[in-house]
């Protein structure tokens, strides 16, 4: 939530990939960041053993610290990204994965693009009906920037610029309640 060295040092203990975000503002780390270095960690789906183990190792490491380092973090130590947009699918659009049914037919392996830097032209799926001619992508300022990130050519939905999706899910309920994913871009730091 902040780019000061102590925050980045704490994030570095959890992962080489660090994401700076300002929305949603209601996360606990935002409140704590007014008092001390605080981060939000992404551990995967609830109950996944790898995520639980990773979080436990991080907490054990933090408990062994006498203090959080405050020296600047170099670009070699972390890959810093900024969340720039949220991809939403309207409730009126029927979604499917790996099939040609529904309005938006997403590739079956979509969740494998999670936290991967992908180039322009990466396929996300196909538009399988006339009900969808534009994917809703909302910037942090509330602007629809879908055309900046995705194109539909011959029914094929693909990225129009390099980007890193995060929190990609194939869970339709989560897509409806929250979003399909967030989009991130690399953030240069010194």
Which role does the model predict for each range below?
Residues 1-190:
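Structured catalytic-domain cores with a bias toward divalent-metal coordination
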């Amino acid at each position: 939530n902040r780019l000061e060295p102590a925050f980045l040092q704490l994030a570095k203990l959890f992962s080489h990939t660090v994401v700076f975000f300002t929305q949603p503002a209601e996360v606990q780390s935002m409140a704590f960041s007014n008092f001390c270095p605080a981060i939000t960690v992404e551990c995967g789906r609830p109950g996944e053993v790898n995520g639980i183990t990773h979080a436990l190792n991080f907490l054990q490491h933090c408990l062994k610290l006498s203090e959080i380092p405050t020296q600047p973090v170099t670009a070699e130590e972390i890959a810093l990204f900024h969340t720039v947009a949220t991809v939403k699918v309207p409730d009126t659009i029927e979604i499917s994965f790996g099939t040609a049914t529904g309005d938006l037919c997403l590739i079956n392996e979509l969740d494998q693009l999670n936290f991967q830097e992908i180039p322009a032209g990466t396929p996300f799926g196909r538009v399988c009906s006339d009900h969808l001619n534009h994917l809703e992508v909302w910037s942090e300022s509330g602007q629809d920037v879908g055309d900046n990130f995705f194109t539909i050519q011959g029914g094929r939905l693909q990225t129009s610029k390099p980007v890193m999706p995060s929190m990609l899910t194939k869970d339709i309920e989560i897509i409806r309640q929250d979003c399909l994913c967030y989009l991130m871009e690399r953030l240069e730091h010194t």
